[in-house]
Amino acid sequence: KSLINMMNPRVNKKLIDVACGTGDIGKLFLDNTNKEAEITCVDPNKGMIGQGKQKLSNYNNIKWFISPAEKLPFADNTFDYYTISFGLRNTKNLNKALSEAHRVLKPGGRYLCLEFSKIQNSNLDFIYKNYSKLIPIIGQFVVGEKEPYDYLIKSIEQFINQDELMDLMEKNSF
């Protein structure tokens, strides 16, 4: 919700939500514009798109596409807002994903990213690393699955740090 507030959504604007999952960001955006905006939800996972279509079937102005972030099937300068939530670290080519984001955004468009990354403060990193060992155990206990939480921790550890991401974003004209 804070992400949506940061965007200050306006009616008649176009949002692309990449790695959209089941469309929660698009729904929140529409709910804040009285459903007077165009939403494009993109995810490489056909199952997530199917669940999103079903869940948000009463939202007529959401278009759904199966596509990776690195190869978006849209013209240059199409969208006013580009969002990606917890999906950037899962792209196969981070540089290409950022390049595509810049390409499809209109001049002056806004790129908003929610993502986990490595902690750069050594004191906090020590706490995080110990806590992160518990997350898969908690996942096993609460939902009966450990593997997705193992993957989450591993993907965060393998992702670049915040400074490296900022450098890469600057190289892609953000």
Where are these regions (language model features)?
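A short glycine-rich, Lys/Arg-flanked "PGG" loop and its adjoining helix->strand segment in the class I
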Residues: 95-110
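Conserved alpha-helix/loop element of class I SAM-dependent methyltransferases that forms part
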Residues: 1-13, 28
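Class I SAM-dependent methyltransferase SAM/SAH-binding core
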Residues: 14-71
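A structural alpha-helix within SAM-dependent methyltransferase catalytic domains
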Residues: 4, 27-30, 98-102
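A short acidic, Gly/Pro-enriched loop at the edge of an enzyme's catalytic core
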Residues: 70-82
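C-terminal alpha-helical "lid/dimerization" subdomain adjacent to the S-adenosyl-L-methionine
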Residues: 42, 114, 118-168, 172
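A short SAM/SAH-binding and catalytic strip from SAM-dependent methyltransferases
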Residues: 80-94
